[in-house]
Curated annotation (Swiss-Prot):
GO cellular component: nucleus; SCF ubiquitin ligase complex
Coiled coil regions in record: none
Gene that this sequence comes from: MAX2A
Subunit structure: Part of a putative SCF (SKP1/Cullin/F-box) ubiquitin ligase complex. Interacts with DAD2. Interacts with KAI2IA in the presence of (-)-germacrene D.
Stored InterPro entries: COI1_F-box, Leu-rich_rpt_Cys-con_subtyp, LRR_dom_sf
Span of domain F-box: 2-49
PANTHER family: F-BOX PROTEIN MAX2, PARTNER OF PAIRED, ISOFORM B-RELATED
Function: Component of SCF(ASK-cullin-F-box) E3 ubiquitin ligase complexes, which may mediate the ubiquitination and subsequent proteasomal degradation of target proteins. Is necessary for responses to strigolactones and may be involved in the ubiquitin-mediated degradation of specific proteins that activate axillary growth. Targets probably SMAX1A to degradation upon the formation of an E3 SCF ubiquitin ligase complex (ASK-cullin-F-box) containing MAX2A and KAI2IA in response to (-)-germacrene D in the stigma.
Annotated protein name in UniProt: F-box protein MAX2 homolog A
Superkingdom of the source species: Eukaryota
Tissues in which the protein is found: Mainly expressed in fully expanded leaves, lateral roots, axillary and shoot apex, and, to a lower extent, in internodes and nodes.
Length: 708
């Protein structure tokens, strides 16, 4: 009789099950037999609780090995988990400790400071904590909340405040007051879009001076020189001087964290220059030799940065990920000589935004020099065209699997997809803007481009055919005995001649594409997506669509539906993020000649019931004047038609009556309202947000029999 998996010794079987990280797979494993159930429960180390805090009798007690516990999504979402007004808060805290005694990493929604008083002391071995809050900061003295936290967590090594609203001066005040805790920190994440002005130079100096052992530091800064205390030479040098052990450094301007798309006609240059230059960058890079991941996302001009990036390559040999915003002169090749970021040959991920002087030649140089790139993002570069992008894709066709092209004037949807044809059978993640190029312009474009040989070494060309731009006699000498592959980059054809035999990209299938992200302007349709070049994506599983614009500038839309039925071309599509949160309109009665947001929701959701979705995240459009993002009646009616849904998360509010529509979805297991945007509404007495209303809906949902 053949040996079965269940015949393995318990120790080996336990190690196998412990190695499975996917939650659904672990749950399936636990259903095999009671023995596997016990092993799965005893080896799970991470858990996210989603039940209602009122149902403490349902708190699981079989996960005794949990070390990472996420309490931020407990229902009702955003309501205080522990506060003086909740019944028996101490009992709730002790029951959590009894169920999960070995927690070392905690995520918790902290709307009331009472949560920080009760929870952290229960786990003295707590080392990592992430605080979540989208509501207003409570009226406390500066730094009081963090003083509570640091007093109760002396062994803290990681603090994540990227989704926690507070004041910027709360943090340095508390860190300076607790030097032992601050010196133990190795990870600090302050990359929070809620900080409207970001951290100033004095605050960054105080934070880095108090935390000399940081290895990962992410912070939102104020680089704009028009503001008092802006971050310039002094602030950047302080980071490198005070925290020399950094392996991950993210410095981003406040405006860089916003979701809003820039002006496609912008030339990439701002009126003001940043108040730091190449010499400062060289000093910073020289002081951080252990850097592996660097983000410098500035919103003011940083000019002539090529020499600094060459020093970055020399001083930081471990660098693998780089993101630059508003940096100019990053790649300005002269003849065959690479420069700037193109010399960072160890990079595996590169993101560039608003590089005003980057052209096709610079883009090609990046493709030649950064030959290990698996991820490439370009945003707001108006001088690059389909020819340069297509050449880069061809140069990186063995490694590139993740691409984002956004807000580039010459790269709309069809042009972007045309440029990526050389890697269309390899790419796994893709973002494009749904700017539908003129069909006539696209078809009539002259079929000329850059033609050159790709016999190269260390980024240099071995072809005299490429003229003075990329010729390299040394490589020609080294490779003259090798097979020569000549590529010609044409908008209408791409072919490879190997000893005279063609091997082109005639198919249109994106075989490995699993994730697709789209930006689309308000009022535009999704229907041209397949005609633009994405008609065949057999393995596409997840799509994210972000709609942005002001509905108030539109009268009635001419078409009945946005075009979600177009996605029926993708047979494996099961997860969708439909983000209309940046769509602005009238929540109530609209002026004559215009329509309110309920009709816009119907426009965008019509046809969603035809898709076989199992998971949906939906952000309703908003009325900024009244800070309202509420699910409308047409939206609730259309969502109830999604008969295959198992998970539905609405990032806004909804009336209880409309929520009850969702009970008609037969296999729906998990529904939640999340106001995870700032500022989250404070009025808990409205019918859209009342805790009792949400609890009644969840109780009705849990009473239904589910087939599996």
């Amino acid at each position: 009789m053949a040996t079965q998996l269940n015949d393995l010794p318990d120790v080996i079987l336990s190690n196998i099950i412990a190695a499975v990280t996917d939650v659904r797979s672990r749950n399936s494993t636990s259903f095999v037999c009671r023995k596997w159930l016990v092993l799965e429960r005893s080896t799970r180390v991470s858990l996210t609780l989603r039940g209602n805090v009122r149902d403490l009798f349902m708190l699981p007690t079989c996960f005794r090995s949990i070390t990472h516990l996420d309490l931020s999504l407990i229902s009702p979402w955003g309501h205080p988990l522990l506060s003086p007004t909740t019944p028996d808060p101490s009992l709730t805290a002790h029951l959590l400790h009894h169920a999960f005694p070995f927690v070392t990493s905690l995520v918790v929604y902290t709307r009331h400071p009472f949560t920080l008083q009760l929870l952290p002391p229960l786990w003295p071995q707590l080392k990592q904590i992430k605080l979540v809050r989208w509501h207003q900061r409570p009226q406390l003295a500066t730094g009081d909340e963090f003083n509570m936290l640091f007093e109760n967590c002396p062994n803290l090594s990681s603090l994540d405040l990227s989704t926690f609203y507070c004041w910027t001066d709360d943090i340095p005040t508390a860190l300076v007051s607790h030097p032992m805790v601050a010196s133990n920190l190795v990870t600090l994440n302050l990359l929070n879009p809620c900080f409207s002005e970001g951290f100033k130079t004095d605050e960054i100096k105080a934070i880095t001076l108090a935390c000399p052992n940081l290895k990962e530091f992410r912070v939102v800064c104020m680089f704009d020189p028009r503001y008092i205390g802006f971050v310039g030479d002094e602030g950047l040098v302080a980071v490198a001087t005070n925290c020399p052990k950094l392996s991950t450094l993210h410095l981003a301007d406040t405006s860089a964290l916003s979701n809003s798309r820039g002006d496609i006609n912008d030339d990439g240059f701002t009126q003001e220059d940043a108040k730091f230059g190449v010499s400062t960058l060289i000093e910073v890079f020289s002081g951080l030799p252990l850097l592996e991941e660097l983000v410098l996302d500035v919103c003011n001009n940083v000019r002539d940065t090529g020499p600094a990036l060459e020093i970055l390559n020399k001083k930081c040999p471990r660098l693998r990920s780089l993101k630059l915003g508003q940096f100019h002169g990053i790649s300005m090749p002269v003849e065959s000589k690479l420069d700037g970021v193109a010399l960072c040959q160890g990079l595996e991920s590169l993101s560039i935004r608003n590089v005003g002087d980057l052209n096709d030649m610079g883009l090609i140089a990046i493709g030649r020099g950064c030959s290990r790139l698996a991820k490439f993002e370009v945003q707001g570069c108006k001088k690059i065209t389909v020819r340069g992008m297509r050449t880069l894709a061809s140069l990186l066709k063995k490694t590139l699997i993740d691409v984002k092209i956004s807000c580039c004037k010459n790269l709309g949807a069809a042009y972007s997809l045309k440029a990526l044809e050389p890697i269309q059978n390899r790419i796994q993640k893709l973002h494009i803007d749904c700017v539908w190029d003129s069909v006539e312009e696209f078809e009539n474009l002259d079929g000329y481009g850059y033609g050159f040989d790709l016999n190269r070494r260390d980024g240099c060309e071995a072809s005299s055919n490429f003229g003075d731009t990329f010729g390299c006699e040394e490589d020609a000498y080294l490779f003259k005995e090798k097979k020569r592959c000549k590529f010609s980059y044409d908008l209408n054809s791409l072919y490879e001649e190997v000893n005279g035999h063609g091997n082109g990209y005639s198919g249109r299938s994106w075989d490995r594409l699993q994730y697709l992200s789209l930006w689309i302007g308000v009022g535009d349709l999704l229907t041209p997506l397949t005609a633009a070049g994405l008609e065949d994506c057999p393995n596409l599983e997840e799509i994210k669509i972000r709609v942005e614009g002001d509905c108030r500038l539109w009268s009635k839309h001419s078409e009945q539906a946005f075009g979600l039925s177009t996605l029926l071309h993708y047979p494996k599509l099961s997860k969708m993020h439909l983000d209309c949160g940046d769509t602005i309109g009238y929540a109530h009665t609209a002026p004559s000649g215009q329509v309110d947001l309920s009709l816009w929701e119907r426009f965008y959701l019509l046809g969603i019931g035809t898709l076989s979705l199992t998971e949906l995240d939906y952000w309703p459009p908003q009325d900024m004047d009244v800070n309202q993002r509420c699910l409308s009646l047409p939206a609730a009616g259309l969502l109830q038609e999604c008969l295959t849904l198992r998970k539905l998360f609405i990032h806004g509010t909804a009336h209880e009556h409309f929520m009850m529509f969702l009970l008609r979805i037969p296999n729906l297991r998990d529904v939640q309202l999340r106001e995870d945007y700032y500022p989250a509404p404070e009025n808990d007495m409205s019918t859209e947000m009342r805790a009792d209303s949400l609890s009644r809906f969840e109780a009705a949902l849990n009473r239904r029999p589910i087939s599996d």
